[in-house]
Amino acid sequence: MLKRAFFPPAILAIILIGGGVPSGWAQSAPPAPVSSNFGGELTSDFKYLANNFEADAEDIVTAPLHLDAAGAMLTNPRFYLIVGGAGAAFGGSFALDQTMRSHLRSMGSSTADLLQNVSYASVSASTAVLYGYGLYSGDSRARQFALTAGEGAGIATLIDIGIKAGFGRLRPSQSPSHTAFFHGGQSFVSGDVTPMFALAAGVSEYYDNTWYISIPIYSLALLDGFGRMGNDAHWFSDVVGAALLGVGTTELFLYLHRQHDENPGRFRVFPVAPPVTSTHGAQSVAPTGIGVAFSW
């Protein structure tokens, strides 16, 4: 179907498509200078992805060795607000499973497919335009947020495969009970919705979650969930669970990438130039190929 064939090229477009300026910037900022160093920017972005992908894997694998950081997190009230909010959202959606199904299951398949295709096209294009704007204007932050969103979408989709296998929930079309877990099904969580929310999170975060960006982009991502429910392929809690997974994965990688930027002395697949200081006590090691960059 169109919606399944569309998504892989759309993710690829995050890296390949150029041109276009986000509307929020067009209204609030003067025209950005046009960058003429596309080749250098693409090379820089490839190194950014490679360096952070390696560092992300290292951070996740070694996380059990840094439980002291978890202790600090547990003393932060914001942690409990986030966990409580996520739990309330999922619990509420689970309670509404049957109600939402009764209202959406009668949706025609053509309408449901249209909602899904609109969601795929708009969210993926928004992320691609953000990356294209970064190329056009030389805004590395825009490109990095788009690339991180793409990474989040890909990793969250892989995690979703494991969640489906672990919970085995039957789809609404397979069982009228929304508690039919561990029956070899693949309903929980939605693999279609997960990457949409991961991409939407990157766009929203680039604009500091400003409401006039966040509400439209997350609403467009949610259209995919409504389309899936219209096709009787998912429960409402499958959609909300997928949204939490997608957003959470992108937010995690954005956080980790900020930490990597603040620690330039760690191992890099591609060496990076250390930050310039006002003294003469700085020395850089920047060999070609695989290496390490240090800053004193």
Locations of the language-model features?
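Residue-level signal for short amphipathic helical patches enriched in basic/charged
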Residues: 52, 95, 106-107, 210
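Alpha-helical transmembrane segments
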Residues: 82-87
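Alpha-helical transmembrane segments of multi-pass membrane proteins
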Residues: 89-98
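Membrane interface segments of multi-pass transport proteins and intramembrane proteases
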Residues: 102-111
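Extended ligand-binding clefts on enzyme/binding-domain cores
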Residues: 132
